Amino acid sequence: MSETKVYPVPETIQRDAHLNFEQYQEMYNRSIQDPEGFWSEQADKFLDWFSKWGTTCHWDLAKGDIRFFEGGTLNVAYNCVDRHLETRGDQTAIIWEGDEPDQDEHITYRDLYERVGRLANALKARGVKKGDRVCIYLPMVPEAAVAMLACARIGAVHSIVFGGFSPEALRDRIQDADAEVVITSDEGVRGGRSIPLKANTDKALEGCPNVKTVFVVRRTGGDIAWNDGRDVWFHEACAEASPDCPPEHMDAEDPLFILYTSGSTGKPKGVQHSTAGYLLGTAMTHKYIFDYQDGEVYWCTADVGWVTGHSYIVYGPLANGAKTLMFEGVPTYPDAGRFWQVVDKHEVSIFYTAPTAIRALMGQGDDHVKKTSRKSLRILGTVGEPINPEAWEWYYHTIGEDRCPIVDTWWQTETGSILIAPLPGAMDLKPGSATLPFFGVEPQLVDDKGNVLEGATNGNLVINRAWPSMMRTIYGDHERFFNTYLAAYPGKYFTGDGARRDEDGYYWITGRVDDVINVSGHRMGTAEVESALVLHDKVSEAAVVGYPHDVKGQGIYAYVTLMAGEEPSDELKQELVKLCIQEIGPIAKPDIIQFAPGLPKTRSGKIMRRILRKVASNELDSLGDTSTLADPTVVDTLIEDRANQ
C-alpha cells in the first residue's frame, strides 16, 4: 500500500483553536469514564433551560431505551434565537445567497425572532399544537429555516422533504407522518431552472385527505393552481400575526423532528430526533469540530432537506449565535467558480461541502478557482461519503492553499451530529481518514459474529454506547428501529458501514456493508429503486447495486429482467429512467441499465447481490464461489453483456 501522507496541525490554527490534543484527550476520556458529569456540564454550558433535568443519561441499547436530560425543559427556538437577542440582536444570523449572483439577504437575530414568532402564531391560529406534524417542502430560502424554528417554538414536529423528491415520494412521507399542514413554495429555483413545488404538492395531496392547510411561499410569482379552502399565502398569514409567541416548554426527550432516510429494505424510515440531546450534539460539534470563532461566517452547502442542512445550516450554528450562510444555487451556476465567488463575497471562514461537489469541481480544472482569492477561508470540511485522497489533496492544496485543515466528518441521519472527525487545532490529518471519535462516542470494529476486534484492523463499525444526539426511534415503528440498528450486535448501535482502524487509532470509513448506495453523498436504498423499476409492466424483476463512479462516488447500476416475449430497447431504458425519477426523484436515476435474461440466485431463490456488485464494478477475478447458484451460467451471461466494460 502507498505511504499515507500526514499533514500536521498548522501553527496558525493551533494558536487560537478551542482545543489542543491534550485537552481533547482529557475531555474525551472524561466523557467515556464519567458520562453523567461530562454531559451535565456540557448541557449547562451550551444550552439554556427553563427547568433542570433529573437523570442526566440513561441508556440500555439492548432494549432500545435511550434518554438524556429527561425531565429538563427547554425550547430549541429560544436557544437558537431569543437568548442571543440581548448580546447580538443586530448581528446577522442568516446570510441568504440566491440562485443568481445578484440576489442576497442578511437576516439579523432580531429579524429572525420576529419572522419565527409570526409564523408560529399563524400555525397556532390554524390549529397546530404541540406534537402535531408539519411537512416542509421548500427550496433553499430563509423561510425554510423560519418554518423549522416556528415548529420548534410551538412544539410541533417538522418533517422536511427535500425539494428534489417527486410528488409520490412527498405523498408517502406526508401520509407516514400523518401531517395536517404542509409548507411549500410556488416554485423553487436551482441552477437557473424552476422546480414546480406547488404543482408537486397539489399532486401529492390527491392522496392526503388529512391535510387541512397549505402555506405557500411566493418565490418566483409563477402561475400556480389554488385551492381556496386549503391554500394560504405564507407572507399574508405572517403579516396578520403577532411577532411575539411564547416558546413552548418542551421536555428534553420530546421529539423535535422526523426526517425520512433510505433503508436497505422497503419504504423510507422516519428517523425521530429528540429536543435537548440533538441540539446539544449539533452545538458542540459545530463549535469544536469546525473550531467556530465568534463573528465568523460559516457555510455548509447542503440542502435543509437533508440532515446536514438541519444540523449544520440551522440548529448547530444558530444555537451558537453564529452567522450561517444558506445557498439556493448549485456549484456550477452561472459557472464552476460560484462556490469560491460566494466565499469571497461573504468572507466565508469555514466551508463544509460534499466530496462529490469537490470531485465535480476538480474535473472543471483550476482556472475558476484561481480567479478568486479565498483568503477568508480558515477551515474546510467534507460530509456525506468518504473522500478519496486525490480529491482531498486538491481541496487542501488548490482551494485551501495549504493553510486550511480539512475536517473529514463521518456521521449519519440517525446519529444527529458528527461522530468521527478531526479537531482542527488538535489532530494531524491523513487524507481520506475520518480520524478520531468525538466526545462520548465509543466506536468499535466487530466481525460478522459480533466479536470485538482490537488494534489495526478492518470490521463492521458499531458504537458501543448511546450519545445525546442519537435518534430515539423510527416514527411509528419502534420495532423496526430496534431491528435495524440495535438487534445485529446486542448492546451496540450498528452503523451499516464498514471501517478500518490504523496503527494510530485513526478510522477510515470503507463504505456501506448493507444494500444502501451512497450517490453524491445521499443515501439511496436499492430496494426503493428496484420497486420503482418493477412497476413497469414489461419488467419481471430488477436488482440494483452501486458501482464506483468518478464524480458521484457511487453510481446506480440496475439489472433488469423482462417479461417473457419482451425485447430490450433504448426506448425502454428511457421509460425505466423516467419511472425512477417519477417515483423517487432525479437522485434515483439509474446510471447504467443492463437487461439480463436471468439473475444469479441461490437454490432458495435469494439474489446473490455480492456477484452483481462485482460484475458492475468489473471485479471479475474475485467473484467467489458461484457453485451454490441455482444456475451458474447466468453469471457468464451477465459478464458477457455487462454495460460497464
UniProtKB/Swiss-Prot annotation:
UniProt entry keywords in alphabetical sequence: Acetylation, ATP-binding, Ligase, Magnesium, Metal-binding, Nucleotide-binding
Chemical reaction(s) catalysed: acetate + ATP + CoA = acetyl-CoA + AMP + diphosphate
Main enzyme class: ligase
GO CC annotation terms, alphabetical: cytosol
Classification via Pfam families: ACAS_N, AMP-binding, AMP-binding_C
Modification N6-acetyllysine, positions: 606
Cofactor or coenzyme needed: Mg(2+)
InterPro entries: Ac_CoA_lig (IPR011904), ACAS_N (IPR032387), AMP-bd_C (IPR025110), AMP-bd_C_sf (IPR045851), AMP-binding_CS (IPR020845), AMP-dep_synth/lig_dom (IPR000873), ANL_N_sf (IPR042099)
Positions of Mg(2+) binding: 534, 536, 539
Residues annotated for CoA binding in this entry: 190-193, 308, 520
Binding, ATP: 384-386, 408-413, 497, 512, 523
GO molecular function per UniProt: acetate-CoA ligase activity; AMP binding; ATP binding; metal ion binding
EC number: 6.2.1.1
Post-translational modification: Acetylated. Deacetylation by the SIR2-homolog deacetylase activates the enzyme.
Keyword Metal-binding belongs to the record: yes
GO BP: any one term: acetyl-CoA biosynthetic process from acetate
HAMAP family in UniProt: Ac_CoA_synth
NCBIfam families noted in UniProt: Ac_CoA_lig_AcsA, PRK00174.1
Family: Belongs to the ATP-dependent AMP-binding enzyme family.
Described function: Catalyzes the conversion of acetate into acetyl-CoA (AcCoA), an essential intermediate at the junction of anabolic and catabolic pathways. AcsA undergoes a two-step reaction. In the first half reaction, AcsA combines acetate with ATP to form acetyl-adenylate (AcAMP) intermediate. In the second half reaction, it can then transfer the acetyl group from AcAMP to the sulfhydryl group of CoA, forming the product AcCoA.
Protein name, entry field: Acetyl-coenzyme A synthetase
